[in-house]
């Protein structure tokens, strides 16, 4: 017998609802069986935002044009990038498209198979996947990547939403793997040594 969100066991009512996700759970719990679909949906949403921003730039800013965005900090500048993130490896569009496709496939498999089992680790893979797919779409259908964010306070390459996802996701994934994976995913590294030590003891 159960009530609304309640379950009767041994004459005692229990709450049978899972607690809502929160930052504390994200940082402290690991769920190897967690459904990867929410992360796929988040990646799709980030790709949609990236493509929407690029579409608005294409429709409203001429090539090389400038539009104020955040005074004294950022302006929107329409640039066609035939290279990788931040204009690296220019004029290698199709090679970069193939690399982006391969990376996207690897990231999908890693996310789906639980390369990182903790939600925080999976979030880093989600950011990387969104960035790779966002720029892959440009290279495949336009032959170049649309960049628009131009920093006014420093000499830096013009970039886009997908580039932000790649950089934030890449740095976060590296830091997570090096410094947090052992703590948040204790069974991931050194499990063999731990089992041997227990057997010897």
Model-assigned labels for residue ranges:
Residues 9-17, 21-201:
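Alpha-helical transmembrane bundles and membrane-interface segments of multipass inner-membrane proteins
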């Amino acid at each position: 017998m159960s009530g609304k969100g309640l379950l009767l066991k041994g004459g005692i009512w229990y709450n049978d609802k899972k607690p809502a996700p929160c930052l504390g759970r994200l940082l402290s719990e690991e769920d190897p069986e967690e459904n990867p679909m929410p992360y796929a949906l988040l990646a799709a949403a980030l790709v949609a935002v990236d493509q929407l921003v690029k579409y608005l730039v294409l429709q409203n800013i001429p090539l090389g044009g400038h539009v104020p965005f955040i005074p004294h900090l950022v302006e929107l500048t329409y640039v066609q990038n035939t290279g990788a993130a931040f204009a690296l490896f220019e004029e290698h569009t199709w090679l970069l498209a193939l690399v982006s496709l391969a990376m996207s496939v690897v990231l999908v498999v890693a996310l789906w198979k639980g390369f990182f089992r903790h939600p925080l680790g999976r979030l880093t893979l989600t950011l990387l996947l969104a960035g790779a797919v966002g720029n892959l779409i440009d290279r495949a259908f336009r032959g170049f990547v649309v960049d628009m964010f131009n920093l006014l306070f420093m000499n830096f390459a013009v970039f886009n939403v997908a580039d932000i996802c790649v950089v934030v996701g890449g740095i976060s994934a590296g830091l997570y793997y090096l410094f947090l994976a052992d703590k948040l995913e204790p069974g991931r590294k050194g499990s063999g040594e731990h089992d041997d030590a227990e057997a010897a003891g």
